[in-house]
Structures are given as C-alpha cells and as structure tokens.
Amino acid sequence: MSAINDPIAAASSGPSEPVQEVQVDVTKLTALSPEVISKQATINIGTIGHVAHGKSSTVRAISGVQTVRFKNELERNITIKLGYANAKIYKCQNPDCPPPSCFKSYPSSKEAHPKCERPGCDGRMDLQRHVSFVDCPGHDILMATMLTGAAVMNGALLLIAGNESCPQPQTGEHLAALEIIGVDPKNIVILQNKMDLVRESEAMEHCESIKKFVEGTTARLAPIIPVSAQLKFNIDAVVAAICNIAPPNYDFSADPRMVVIRSFDVNKPGAGVDELKGGVAGGSILQGVFKVGQEVEIRPGLITRDANGVCTCRPLRSRIVSLHAEQNHLQFAVPGGLIGVGTLVDPALCRADRLLGMVMSSVGKGPSIYVEIRAEVFLLRRLLGVKTDDSKKAKVGKLVVGETLFVNIGASQTGGRITAVKGGDVSIALTTPACCEKGEKIALSRRIDKHWRLIGWGKVRSGGTLCEVVDPE
C-alpha cells in the first residue's frame, strides 16, 4: 500500500536520527484552539451501519478521501480494515449566506480562510472543526473490527439505506455497540442514504420506520438527514450537523496515552539498510500531549510464554521521530483525531497491524496489563444482527463456566475463557494479555452459527496484574 495518500503511514517521513523533545505549554491548548485544529483533527466520528449502506461513500463525499485502499477491499468493493480520513469543516462568515449552504467540507490540507464557493457570495470561510472519520466495516463477520473502531469514537454517523427495509441486522448490532462504548446520544446523526433511488412517498414511509426503530435507543435524539452520498446531495446539511458535535473535555496536562488501532511497516521491498525507517503506529490520543523526540513505551509489547504457559510481557520502548495528521507534519499532537506516530521500533513488529490494541504512553506511565479480569457483566435481552423467526433462538443465554468468548477491551481483541460466575460478576481468563483500567468497558461476543455475535458488555472491576520484564536497554 502506498504511503503517499495514507494519513497514518505518512508519519514515516520523519527523520530517523535522534531528535530533541519539543517544548509545549499545554495549559494554553484546547480542542478548538486555531493553532491545533489548523493542523490536526480533534474529534473522531465513526460511520456505522449495515453492509453496502454507503458508509465509505459518505466519508468520500465529505472528505474527498477514498478509505477503501487495500487490493482485496477494492476487488470485493467492501471495507475490511478500518478506514480513516480527515476533513476540515468551514463556515462562511457572510451573514447573508444561509445555512446549511454556508457550511463546506474540504480535505485537511486546505488553507485557513478559503473563499466561499456559493454563487453570488464573496465572503471568507472560517475553520469550525477538524474531524477524523473512522470508517467501520458493515459485514457481520467483521463485527470485531467495528468494535475496535468504536473504542475511539466521540460521535457517529448511522447510515441507513432508504431502498431497504429498516432495521437491517448490522444496523441494530452497530447501534448496540455505540451504547456499550458510551457514545453521547447527542453526538449521533442518522443519515437516510440513497434518496436518489426511491420516490418521495417511499422515503417518508422509510423515515417513519427509522423513527420507530430508534425509539428507546441511544440514537433516540439523533436528527434524520436524507442524503445521497453518490450525488453529494445534502452533504452540506451533514457537515452542519457535525459542527454541533462538541469535542470531549480532554485532559491535556495528564500523562499522554494513545490507543493503537493500526500499525505499519512502510519500508518498500528491496530497501537498503540505510534507507530503513522504524515502524509506524496509528491511533487516537486519549489524554495528554505527545511531542516529537519524546521517549515512549508501547504495552503489552512482546508477549512470551514459558513451558508452564505463564505469560511474560516486555514493553517496547522507543523515541517519537515524527508525528503526522495526514500530510500535516506536527511538532506535538493533542487528544482526538487519528495520528500517525513514527518510531524507531523494529518495523517487523509493526507490520500488518501487529500493534493493534496496544497502548502507547510515557515510559513507566502505561496502564496495567491483565491476564485475567473480573467484570460486572450485562447481557443483551436478545441476539442482534441475526435474522430469525424463532424467538427462543434469538434470546441470549446465560454465561457458563468454561465457555469461550471473544472480548474487546478498548481497541484490543482477545479470546477469553470464563473461570467463575457469581451473580452479575464474571471472571475471564484472557488468551493474550491486554491493557485496561478499572471501570473500563468491555464488549463480549459469543460464537453463534460460525460467527461472533455481540451478546453483552461489562465493566472491569479488577484483575490479576501481569508480571512484566522490561528490557534493560
């Protein structure tokens, strides 16, 4: 995959020699500071919904970026890995320029004050938001990938195709995932897509079915906007709605921490030893500020097992050599948005998303690593994402000791075996160690009809902390 148009892989273009740590006064920064949003996104918006309802097309209509990049994705015309794209949203300052026409989105390389493109308007536009889109796959077998993307979302666009009945299986499953992760109901926007394929009367009936579907769900407050992503119809109304999504109150002064959702080896085949670049980690900063030249640690890092099956973790330590938000080179990166971090880590350890789910932090300031967790679990009343006429089959059965589940902790994905069940509390032995904090939410999936299906969620109470071995060098 080419790194030229890749917002995360672009981070590899930084220098390979040691660099001095940048000094930043974090007390003067906010998520909407002009000097921040001019260079990097500070809010993550996910696109969710059933397969082929227009998630990637909507991101392309807003940002101009094609998120489907890999050969197998292009051949099958579906999203398989998490897609990502940045966009700047501007508003015309001419009071005679009416909404939503006064809103316009551009790629993240756009200048600070472009001229308004509405015919007859000579006003200038001001930057309102800089947004990262997390484009999730809609196929049922890729639900685990969707949950990884949901871990970094601040808001969401729920795509529902107007030419199909509502709800489709993954529409409900993705909406439940938003509720589990805890996305604010005010930060969800419903897009009734493919309006160019239906009559007005059909669109109105479909809109009523959407309203009925979202009653009592986390999307109950969401506005419903009719759009056509292919024709870019009503996209100005969508970006106006995105401007109503406020960035979270990030803690800029806390110890920096970033969850990794993609990682790359950006070296071309046949590159000489002198040309090799370190691995690139892509993800979203949760708190604090990362700076070029800073010493960082990636946990859990290298995981080994002895003859008795006891796990040992060796966190990876490195220095940040570059920070990128798409083509924008950064000296420091703040929470929100998707950031590419160029490091000196062996690229073989980063290729093919091998750092997925790991956490980057200052040295010695990372989260605890668990091999077993105890969590308070809440099961869904019925199975989502499955078409069935049998009500008994659709009900979610109780958890039993010895059962194997698929567990999403933050962006990490691992198997888990239930070792104890007591009331609503469950102990789960993890197949591979994972970073988490007490109180963190987890998603649980059970294997049903050869697919992992979302069955519930939980809150981490405690766990057996993993013994670590830190590389003395």
Curated annotation (Swiss-Prot):
<dbReference type="InterPro" id="IPR000795">
    <property type="entry name" value="T_Tr_GTP-bd_dom"/>
</dbReference>
<feature type="binding site">
    <location>
        <begin position="228"/>
        <end position="230"/>
    </location>
    <ligand>
        <name>GTP</name>
    </ligand>
</feature>
<dbReference type="Pfam" id="PF03144">
    <property type="entry name" value="GTP_EFTU_D2"/>
</dbReference>
<dbReference type="GO" id="GO:0001731">
    <property type="term" value="P:formation of translation preinitiation complex"/>
</dbReference>
<keyword id="KW-0597">Phosphoprotein</keyword>
<dbReference type="InterPro" id="IPR009001">
    <property type="entry name" value="Transl_elong_EF1A/Init_IF2_C"/>
</dbReference>
<keyword id="KW-0963">Cytoplasm</keyword>
<dbReference type="InterPro" id="IPR027417">
    <property type="entry name" value="P-loop_NTPase"/>
</dbReference>
<dbReference type="InterPro" id="IPR044127">
    <property type="entry name" value="eIF2g_dom_2"/>
</dbReference>
<dbReference type="InterPro" id="IPR044128">
    <property type="entry name" value="eIF2g_GTP-bd"/>
</dbReference>
<feature type="region of interest" description="G3">
    <location>
        <begin position="135"/>
        <end position="138"/>
    </location>
</feature>
<keyword id="KW-0489">Methyltransferase</keyword>
<dbReference type="GO" id="GO:0005525">
    <property type="term" value="F:GTP binding"/>
</dbReference>
<feature type="region of interest" description="Interacts with CDC123">
    <location>
        <begin position="458"/>
        <end position="470"/>
    </location>
</feature>
<keyword id="KW-0648">Protein biosynthesis</keyword>
<feature type="binding site">
    <location>
        <begin position="193"/>
        <end position="196"/>
    </location>
    <ligand>
        <name>GTP</name>
    </ligand>
</feature>
<dbReference type="GO" id="GO:0005829">
    <property type="term" value="C:cytosol"/>
</dbReference>
<dbReference type="GO" id="GO:0005850">
    <property type="term" value="C:eukaryotic translation initiation factor 2 complex"/>
</dbReference>
<dbReference type="InterPro" id="IPR015256">
    <property type="entry name" value="eIF2g_C"/>
</dbReference>
<dbReference type="InterPro" id="IPR004161">
    <property type="entry name" value="EFTu-like_2"/>
</dbReference>
<keyword id="KW-0396">Initiation factor</keyword>
<feature type="region of interest" description="G5">
    <location>
        <begin position="228"/>
        <end position="230"/>
    </location>
</feature>
<keyword id="KW-0547">Nucleotide-binding</keyword>
<dbReference type="GO" id="GO:0032259">
    <property type="term" value="P:methylation"/>
</dbReference>
<feature type="region of interest" description="G4">
    <location>
        <begin position="193"/>
        <end position="196"/>
    </location>
</feature>
<dbReference type="InterPro" id="IPR009000">
    <property type="entry name" value="Transl_B-barrel_sf"/>
</dbReference>
<dbReference type="GO" id="GO:0008168">
    <property type="term" value="F:methyltransferase activity"/>
</dbReference>
<dbReference type="Pfam" id="PF00009">
    <property type="entry name" value="GTP_EFTU"/>
</dbReference>
<keyword id="KW-0378">Hydrolase</keyword>
<feature type="region of interest" description="G1">
    <location>
        <begin position="49"/>
        <end position="56"/>
    </location>
</feature>
<dbReference type="GO" id="GO:1990856">
    <property type="term" value="F:methionyl-initiator methionine tRNA binding"/>
</dbReference>
<keyword id="KW-0808">Transferase</keyword>
<dbReference type="Pfam" id="PF09173">
    <property type="entry name" value="eIF2_C"/>
</dbReference>
<feature type="binding site">
    <location>
        <begin position="52"/>
        <end position="57"/>
    </location>
    <ligand>
        <name>GTP</name>
    </ligand>
</feature>
<comment type="function">
    <text>As a subunit of eukaryotic initiation factor 2 eIF2, involved in the early steps of protein synthesis. In the presence of GTP, eIF-2 forms a ternary complex with initiator tRNA Met-tRNAi and then recruits the 40S ribosomal complex and initiation factors eIF-1, eIF-1A and eIF-3 to form the 43S pre-initiation complex (43S PIC), a step that determines the rate of protein translation. The 43S PIC binds to mRNA and scans downstream to the initiation codon, where it forms a 48S initiation complex by codon-anticodon base pairing.</text>
</comment>
<keyword id="KW-0342">GTP-binding</keyword>
<dbReference type="GO" id="GO:0003924">
    <property type="term" value="F:GTPase activity"/>
</dbReference>
<dbReference type="GO" id="GO:0002183">
    <property type="term" value="P:cytoplasmic translational initiation"/>
</dbReference>
<dbReference type="InterPro" id="IPR050543">
    <property type="entry name" value="eIF2G"/>
</dbReference>
<comment type="similarity">
    <text>Belongs to the TRAFAC class translation factor GTPase superfamily. Classic translation factor GTPase family. EIF2G subfamily.</text>
</comment>
<protein>
    <recommendedName>
        <fullName>Eukaryotic translation initiation factor 2 subunit gamma</fullName>
        <ecNumber>3.6.5.3</ecNumber>
    </recommendedName>
</protein>
<feature type="domain" description="tr-type G">
    <location>
        <begin position="40"/>
        <end position="250"/>
    </location>
</feature>
